[in-house]
C-alpha cells in the first residue's frame, strides 16, 4: 500500500511537471513570446541567477523581441526590455499593475499597514509625507553637514598620508553617516548612531528572501532570520518611542520645533484627520533609509572606481576642472546647479550598472505592451540592467562614457519613471556629488587591479564585487583653498 502511494505520488508529480512545462511553452497569439522551459518548477531561475544580463540579452536576441516571458520558480515573468515601451510599464495605475503582491517580502521590515502593505490611497499619502521631507527647501543646509561627516570619516579612518581601503565598505559608512546627519535630529543621533542604525538595517535586510517574490510560500518558513528582523524593528521602534516622549515633554515646556525627518512624519496628518502611528513612522523611516542606503553606496563606489581608472583620466581631469574652482566649503548651489559633469558621472554609473536588476508589478488586468497583451496573473518587470544595455539607446553599453546621451527618449530608468519615480532622487544626487567632490579634492586614488570590478549579481542590490574594491588613497600635499 505504501509503495503504491509513492508510485502514485511520483506519477502525479511527473504528469504535473509535463503539464506545467507544456502549459508555459504554449501561448496565445497575443501573448509575448516565451523563452522555452525544459526544467519544471525551477524554470529559468538558475540561468537568470548566474548572469542576469547575459541571460536576458540572450532571450531578447533569440526571440527577436524586447518584450518576452520567462519562468522563475514556476511564475511567469514578462520582461519589458524595449526602451520604446517603458511607458507601458510605468504609466498604469497601481490597480492595474500592482506592486503590493511582488513586494510582500518587505512587510516584515516596513511593517503591516506601511508602504506596499497599506491600501493604495493610504500608501500614496505616506509617500507624499516622505516626499515633503525631501524637498529642496530642506536641502539648503545639507551640503555642509555632508561635508562635515565625510571629512570626519576620512580623518578617523584614512589617518595616514597613504593607505589601502575597501572603497565599497567605506562608501557605505559615509552614506549612512551623512544620511543620519541630514535626516535625523541630534537627539535621535545620540540614541541611534549611524553604526548602530546600520546594524539594525543589516539584521532586517538579512531576513529578506528575494526568491519569495516568485515563490511566496518561502515567507511562511520559520527561519531564524525572521525572528532577528522582528527584534531589530522592535528595538528601533522602542528608541523612536522614547525620543517622541522626550520631545513632547520639551514642547510642553518650551518652543521646540525639531525639523528633522522624524519630526516631519510625526506632524503629518492623513486626509481623515488622523496622525501617523509610531508603528507607521518607524516603518517610513526604515523605508527611506532602506531605499537609499545601498543604492547611494553602490552609485558612489562605481563613480569613484571609474574615475580613478587610468583609462578614464580625461574624465577625472574634467571633473577636477569643474570642482577645483569651488571653495573648500561647498554650498547647495555649487553641488546641484554648478556640477553638471559630476552629475553626468553619477548617472552614467547608474546607467552602466544599475543597483536594481528589475522593477516588478503583478498584472491585475490585461495590459497591452507593443503588439502584445500581457495576461492577468503574470509578473511584469522592467529591467534597468537590460534596457540600459540596449544597443540602440546606448551604443557600446559597457563603455563608461559620462558624456553619452540616450538615443531613445525615456531609455534611462535609473530613478524609475511615472507614478513611482524615486522621491529621493535629488537627495541621492546631492549626497553622492558632495562626497565625490570632497573626496577627489582632498585625495588621489588608485585602483589596485587592472580593471574596474565586476558586478556582483549574487547580492539583492547589485554593486561592485566586494573583494575587488581595494583602493590605495594618497592625501594631497596641499588642499585647495
From Swiss-Prot:
It catalyses: a 14alpha-methyl steroid + 3 reduced [NADPH--hemoprotein reductase] + 3 O2 = a Delta(14) steroid + formate + 3 oxidized [NADPH--hemoprotein reductase] + 4 H2O + 4 H(+). The keyword Transcription does not apply. Its cofactor is heme. It is an enzyme of class 1 (oxidoreductase). One of its GO terms (molecular function) is iron ion binding. Catalyzes C14-demethylation of lanosterol which is critical for ergosterol biosynthesis. It transforms lanosterol into 4,4'-dimethyl cholesta-8,14,24-triene-3-beta-ol. Favors C4 dimethylated substrates, the substrate preference order is 24-methylenedihydrolanosterol > 24,25-dihydrolanosterol > lanosterol > obtusifoliol > norlanosterol. This is Sterol 14-alpha demethylase. It comes from Trypanosoma cruzi (strain CL Brener).
